[in-house]
């Protein structure tokens, strides 16, 4: 993200320290992908979009944190998990006011994303009140994400729950 609210290397290290991992397991966060819908970085955006699509199709991606404008672009393009179905009851209740709902072409409404404004990455950093930060950042889970239990754990970590 352009404000470095979600620095992958730091999040990877901090989150991994909260997990019990075997030698074969590792936590990977990738912030090298960049989607610019304004056309400023069109070649890089196309490459990032292709990589993101490939990760989703191969079911190698657990979640994405992105701006409101990129979520708006992807919400009707990529199938996303319904967070109300994915989250356990206690987490669903705690995060209910942060859910972002979308109605698809068939009229089905699902919780496709989660507003990250009150997460440890944004709240209290000043970014949540900074007028220069022009986007809201959302967490979404592509359909077929391979590690749903880790998604739940990461959200608990993100919101201190």
Q: Where does each model-flagged region fall?
A:
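Short, flexible loop/turn elements at secondary-structure junctions
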Residues: 2, 33, 87, 143-145
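Extracytoplasmic "Venus flytrap"/periplasmic binding protein-like
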Residues: 47-107
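Long, glycine/tryptophan/cysteine-rich extracytoplasmic
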Residues: 115-137
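A bilobed periplasmic-binding-protein/Venus flytrap-type ligand-binding module shared by bacterial periplasmic
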Residues: 133-147
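A recognition module on extended beta-rich or small alphabeta surfaces enriched in W/G with H and D/E
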Residues: 103-112, 125
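Extracytoplasmic/periplasmic/luminal assembly and interaction segments
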Residues: 3-71
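Short amphipathic alpha-helical coupling segments at ligand-binding clamshell hinges
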Residues: 146-157
């Amino acid at each position: 993200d352009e404000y470095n609210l979600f620095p992958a290397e730091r999040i990877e290290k901090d989150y991994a320290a909260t997990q019990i991992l075997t030698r074969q397991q590792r936590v990977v966060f990738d912030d090298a992908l960049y989607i610019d819908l304004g056309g400023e970085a069109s070649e890089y955006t196309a490459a990032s979009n292709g990589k993101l699509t490939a990760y989703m199709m191969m079911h190698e991606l657990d979640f994405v944190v992105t701006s409101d404008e990129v979520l708006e672009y992807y919400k009707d393009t990529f199938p996303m998990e319904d967070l109300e179905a994915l989250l356990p009851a206690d987490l669903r209740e705690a995060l209910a006011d942060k859910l972002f709902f979308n109605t698809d072409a068939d009229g089905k409404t699902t919780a496709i994303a989660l507003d990250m404004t009150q997460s440890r990455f944004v709240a209290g950093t000043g970014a949540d009140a900074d007028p220069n930060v022009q986007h809201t950042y959302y967490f979404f889970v592509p359909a077929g994400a391979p590690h749903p239990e880790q998604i739940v754990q990461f959200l608990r970590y993100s919101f201190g729950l």
